[in-house]
Regions:
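Anionic-ligand binding patches
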Residues: 2-5, 11-205
Length: 205
């Protein structure tokens, strides 16, 4: 069977998706291995449309079944911002975290928030299935933890009261928005959402 393409150049996302798909019994490949970068515009109105666009474009270009995601952080005090613009709030992860804290400084705490993730699986003929997941918590004022990426060091997950950067990868990959989106995708596939999909019913976690 041809490999499944993970369509991201974000090394943190790539690592998580590889771990979440590890027991699927599939060969996995990625954009770095294939030398592909279509510079897909991530300017859609919502996470579904952006994940759909990335997955379908890379599936068509590669001829491979392709999985892609789009994720955003929604903060209640900022009326759901940065949302789909989370990755474009500033130039890199540290400056994005600093900018978010700057924007929140004038608002009373707690700064409740949630990550939302859409995962799209696309076939080379244009067929697509989507999964969605979220993870609730709040933004904290000081970075904590050495793991994770993005906003993880300032996002305290509601159930554990630890930031996502404080969680071991195995634990994060059981409760994160991305893990829940992949679980949701697999559940939809098990109900026949995408006949011929290379992915199996839910067994990860």
């Amino acid at each position: 069977m041809p490999p499944l393409l993970i369509a991201t150049t974000n090394l943190g996302k790539l690592s998580e998706l590889k771990a979440l798909l590890a027991d699927q019994g599939l060969e996995l490949t990625d954009l770095l291995q294939l030398g592909m970068d279509l510079a897909v515009a991530e300017d859609g109105p919502d996470y579904d449309s952006i994940a759909h666009r990335k997955a379908t474009l890379y599936a068509a270009a590669s001829g491979l079944w392709t999985i892609a995601d789009d994720t955003g952080l929604e903060v209640d005090a900022l009326a759901g911002a940065p949302g789909v613009r989370s990755a474009r709030l500033s130039q890199n992860d540290p400056s994005r975290r600093a900018e978010l804290l700057r924007l929140l400084a004038a608002h009373p705490r707690p700064w409740t928030a949630r990550f939302r993730c859409s995962v799209a699986l696309a076939g080379p003929r244009g067929e697509v299935a989507l999964g969605r997941g979220d993870c609730g918590g709040e933004i904290v004022t000081q970075e904590r933890g050495d793991s994770g990426f993005g906003y993880d060091p300032i996002f305290q997950e509601a159930g554990t009261q630890r930031t996502l950067a404080e969680l071991p990868a195995l634990e994060k990959n059981q409760i994160s928005h991305r893990a829940r989106a992949v679980h949701d995708l697999l559940a939809r596939l098990a109900r026949g959402a995408l006949p011929g999909s290379p992915l199996s019913p839910p067994s990860i976690g």
